Amino acid sequence: YGVSKAATDKMTADMAEELEPHGVAVICLYPGLVRTESVMRAAEFLDLSNSESPQFIGRAVAALASDPEVIKRTGTVCVAAALAKEYGFADIDGKQPVPLSIKDV
């Protein structure tokens, strides 16, 4: 799992370097625990108090897409919950998931 995340982060950085001169921002976007069908089947074993709906990551994408200065983020890794705090959006249930750090996992 960690190797695939590292590869995605590296690909993001490399693509950003190639595409920034063309005005294209490349951003790696990490969701938190998403309430997918699979996650909900295991809900009795999980703490879903800080989970996100599948729509939440879409709101993060929409916020980035509407940001006229998004190019400043190119090559970065962003966490959806942190973007929610910055851009002021919430999940469909009105909650704002707390951004987790590696220490929290």
Predicted feature locations:
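Conserved cofactor-binding/catalytic machinery of classical short-chain dehydrogenase/reductase
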Residues: 7-10, 35, 53-56, 60
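C-terminal helical subdomain
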Residues: 28, 47-105
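Active-site-adjacent segment of SDR/Rossmann-fold oxidoreductases
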Residues: 14-24, 68-71
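Catalytic tyrosine of NAD(P)H-dependent dehydrogenase/reductases that use a Tyr as the general acid/base
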Residues: 1
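Hydrophobic alpha-helix immediately C-terminal to the catalytic Tyr-X-X-X-Lys motif of short-chain
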Residues: 7, 11-15, 19, 29
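Short beta-loop-alpha junction of Rossmann-like oxidoreductase domains
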Residues: 24, 30-43
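Active-site helix of classical SDR
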Residues: 4
